[in-house]
Amino acid sequence: MMGKGFLDCESLVALQEMALHPIDLTASGCLSEERIQKNSLSVEGFTYSYATERVDDRCLEALQGLTEERELIKQMECMQQGAIMNRIEGFQSESRPVLHTATRAWVRDQDLHEEAAAIARHSKEEALRLAEFLYIARAKFSTLVQIGIGGSELGPKAMYFAMQGSCPSDKRIFFVSNIDPDNAAEVLREIDLEQTLVVVVSKSGTTLEPAANEELFRQAYQNKGLSIAEHFVAVTSQGSPMDDKSRYLEVFHLWDSIGGRFSATSMVGGVVLGFAFGYEAFIEFLQGAAAIDAHALTPKMRENLPLLSAMLGVWNRNLLGYPTTAVIPYSTGLKYFTAHLQQCGMESNGKSISREGKEISFRTSPIIWGDVGTNCQHSFFQSLHQGTDIVPVEFIGFLHNQRGLDCVLSGSSSSQKLFANLVAQSLALAQGRDNANPNKRFKGNSPSSILVAQQLSPRIAGSLLAFYEHKFAFQGFCWGINSFDQEGVSLGKELATQIIGIMSGNAPVEFPEARGVLRLFNVLT
């Protein structure tokens, strides 16, 4: 199903040769209007410009060839239809489908195979139950606290703040994730428990951080003499320890085939987004994601937004050798989006083993980082322009702000100034500027792309979420790795459990290295 191995692809050989002399973005006339128009794509409310990437037509044709040799569209089709994509052949692995797309497939008319259709059907049933629940909960409660970790917090939190500016709401929303009790304490200080709905999210029902934070909140409710069962909601797998209606006001379900970092369109995101903005806004969010799911099956790379972005990322990572990628949204609403992308990209593709269980000899996920513009122009952009490492940048922007507040100063609005800065940074990174004073010299040739929509709405938020989900999936398919497990998370958790045993005096085995470290910090005597 994967075609040739990544390093065996003929297209890769051609790309390696092109990478020796990539297009010079600093050359006079390089960024002509013709190039800018030609190297752009408009789809599902977005316009994507990649004229400032170091690619030309020959390079793009070779990247298209690589997508065909690796059968990337076929792999995407298989994933959406419920094939076993989360696997390592010949070794113990999760061996399950990857069906986050099915959680929103029911909002459009899609022909799905059996397992995908079942998840879509169950997702619709859960959404309808959610609508009934929200009718009562939104009338009764003014505040919601979501307790979760990883994908149970990062994606929903990013999407909540993305939608907050365009969806009027009188609801207060808080997120508690860190096992550090100060995280829970600062939220407890801000809320009226009687007016608060607590949503606990854990697929297994046993995850350490949500369990500890749930206990802190349960103790707070007990101390106030309030009914826990009337204020707590669970989002978990069927049959998990949390799947217990006697302990919760309501229990919503998710499935093993939906990974945490891809779960924002399931009830993991549905309860908090629906409570905050209403059921209709949540459906609009799902519709945006579902539209990109369908679009991601477009065969031609230059007409397929997530595939094109994925392959430009492969070019920058594997052919030009850039180790990091910065994602810079010029929108306050996306202030937590890069943190979500760090998990979605690096937990998915930070792998060194192929799907055949073999060590790989090429680079996979870049380090993903970033912050909101224009703020970050006054922090790390100095390094992007004149540092020793070239960092590809993915700019995200909007032509109109969310809240409508603006002013005109010196002949332009704040929204215009914001967008002008986005464009200026992309051009400055690409073209650079020569100067006789070396301290004022900008080398240029730093690649970037620009993704723009009219305004950050619930539908656009859903589309943006799905765009990056599919971008990372396509890259994993190209590299031949399993983008859908996270074994790297487990070792530290196992050792932490042993160390907790030592600290509590109940260690089942000796762990001298840990004892030594604990004694150093006076945790053990």
From Swiss-Prot:
This is Glucose-6-phosphate isomerase. It catalyses: alpha-D-glucose 6-phosphate = beta-D-fructose 6-phosphate. GO terms for biological process: gluconeogenesis; glucose 6-phosphate metabolic process; glycolytic process. The active site is at E347, H378, K493. Pfam families: PGI. Keywords: Cytoplasm, Gluconeogenesis, Glycolysis, Isomerase. It is found in: Cytoplasm. It is an enzyme of class 5 (isomerase). It comes from Chlamydia trachomatis serovar L2 (strain ATCC VR-902B / DSM 19102 / 434/Bu).
